[in-house]
């Protein structure tokens, strides 16, 4: 357990550094380009590589782990050889996919941004084609990440986004005046290449990064792997398609809506990426091991993960709800990012925040279903989610503008999470005692959330400060103080366990 806590601490620290750089990158983009037609073109152009990586790259990162773990129980050498073959296959496929999207870029961008004028579409096409080859490097990086994380070597995968963010920051400051938005696109591609370079020294000892074309010899494993990954890819594409739908609808709204939606989603993802996803990352290899061993610890780990994610999310959500405008102003309010841009972004950010916990829980539940090789469930629930999101985005944006689009996403995430929970008893034997304890603890967590939210909101009205940073610090301090106090009052299990771990760790 101490090793898990230590790993979580290390990758959380790296994630903070990475996200601060990423946030600095986004802040500079906002300051230099604002919510303009140029920034809209860049954000639409980045969707295709992002969707390809998030749907295929993240699927590889998650899906290869149980395959590698199963084979490794029999032979380390065979496990490495299989990963070499699969890695080669994925890389070849990524090149083919890149070529196809390169050819059909104008068609795809016109679908994603139907409200763009011709000049804006041409800029979007150029930026997209520059960034598309990054997908090939992302696939190689994903193969490396899956093995390193299973081997509990979390540091190199956590470091991969740092050089990319640094390159983009340098490009914005020193090159954007000369090359404009193209400087960001080019450095995005360079940064993707460095994701492979950073992980290579650590992955070299596992002997998996070599071209191995023995596809026929490993036909059965390849077939089983593709059958496992295919539903995951469909599920990931469906989830990423939500972002496309959001931006398609936003492109029909007033100019700058796409950028406001992008800035808001990145602000919402900040605590998710820094705290919640690292926790899922360090726990996932243990979930896979428990699934391979087929013991009774899998059920306990599942509910424990849900409890921990909910517990950690509560103070984050309260600060986001109470100080949504202040967070947006602190993050972006400079340069050409004016009052109008701030209003639009705040509107979207508040409603995106409603879905943060459900996004984290969805990721955790999806990992569980991957570990037990029931990936079709993740596919079905993702399809339900995207259909709901399309209907709600179109409907709610008529009333709430970009806020309606964000609210639609949050409602879709909420629905998907509870459908995944519905399938749990069908795939896992759940002890009645464990389930009752889980339900009781969540009642306590809900009471803690409600009590802390009401008092924090009341206090924030009383101590309004002219400096945004002071206001945010005060709200965060009172939120944490009240959260710990109510957790103690309601006897929340996670507070007691966190206290015990702290003293044991010391």
Regions found by a protein language model. Name each.
Residues 58-73, 276-295, 366:
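Helix-loop junctions and terminal segments of transmembrane helices
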Residues 155, 163-197, 376, 384-422, ...:
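Membrane-interface helix-loop junctions in multi-pass transport and translocation proteins
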Residues 457-506:
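Membrane-proximal transmembrane or re-entrant/amphipathic helices at the cytosolic face
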Residues 7-27, 191, 195, 199-203, ...:
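Transmembrane helical elements of multi-pass membrane transporters/channels
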């Amino acid at each position: 357990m101490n090793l898990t806590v230590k790993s979580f601490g290390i990758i959380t620290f790296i994630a903070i550094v990475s996200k601060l750089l990423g946030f600095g990158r986004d802040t500079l983009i906002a300051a230099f380009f604002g919510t303009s037609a140029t920034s809209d073109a860049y954000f639409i152009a980045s969707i295709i590589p992002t969707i390809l990586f998030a749907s295929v790259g993240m699927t590889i990162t998650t899906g290869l782990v149980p395959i590698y773990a199963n084979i490794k129980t029999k032979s380390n050498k065979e496990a490495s050889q299989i990963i070499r073959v699969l890695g080669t296959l994925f890389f070849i496929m990524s090149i083919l996919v890149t070529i196809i999207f390169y050819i059909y870029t104008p068609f795809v961008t016109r679908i994603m941004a139907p409200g763009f004028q011709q000049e804006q579409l041409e800029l979007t096409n150029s930026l997209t084609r520059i960034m598309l080859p990054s997908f090939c490097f992302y696939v190689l990086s994903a193969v490396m990440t899956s093995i390193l994380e299973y081997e509990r070597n979390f540091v190199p995968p956590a470091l991969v986004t740092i050089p990319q963010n640094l390159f983009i920051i340098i490009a914005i400051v020193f090159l954007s005046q000369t090359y404009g938005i193209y400087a960001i696109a080019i450095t995005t591609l360079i940064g993707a290449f460095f994701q492979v370079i950073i992980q290579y020294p650590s992955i070299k000892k596992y002997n998996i990064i070599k071209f191995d074309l023995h596809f026929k010899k490993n036909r059965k494993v390849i077939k089983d792997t593709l059958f496992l990954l295919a539903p995951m890819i469909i599920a990931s594409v469906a989830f990423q398609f939500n972002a496309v739908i959001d931006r398609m609808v936003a492109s029909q709204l007033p100019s700058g809506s796409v950028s406001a939606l992008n800035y808001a989603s990145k602000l919402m993802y900040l605590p998710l990426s820094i705290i919640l996803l690292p926790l899922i990352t360090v726990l996932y290899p243990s979930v896979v091991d428990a699934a391979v061993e087929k013991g009774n610890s899998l059920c306990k780990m599942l509910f424990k993960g849900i409890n921990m994610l909910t517990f950690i999310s509560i103070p984050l959500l309260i600060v986001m709800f109470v100080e949504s405008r202040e967070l947006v102003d602190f993050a972006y309010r400079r340069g050409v990012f004016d009052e109008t841009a701030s209003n639009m972004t705040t509107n979207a950010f508040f409603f995106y925040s409603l879905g943060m916990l459900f996004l984290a829980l969805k990721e955790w539940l999806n990992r569980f279903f991957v570990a037990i090789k029931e990936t079709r469930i993740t596919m079905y629930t993702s399809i339900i989610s995207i259909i709901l999101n399309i209907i709600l985005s179109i409907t709610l944006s008529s009333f709430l503008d970009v806020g309606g689009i964000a609210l639609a996403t949050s409602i879709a995430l909420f629905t998907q999470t509870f459908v995944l929970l519905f399938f749990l008893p069908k795939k896992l034997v759940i002890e009645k005692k464990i389930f009752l304890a889980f339900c009781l603890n969540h009642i306590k967590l809900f009471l803690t959330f409600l009590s802390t939210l009401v008092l924090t909101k009341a206090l924030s009205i009383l101590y309004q400060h002219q400096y945004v940073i002071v206001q945010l610090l005060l709200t965060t301090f009172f939120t944490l103080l009240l959260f710990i106090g109510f957790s103690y009052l309601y006897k929340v299990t996670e507070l007691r366990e966190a206290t015990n771990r702290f003293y044991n760790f010391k």
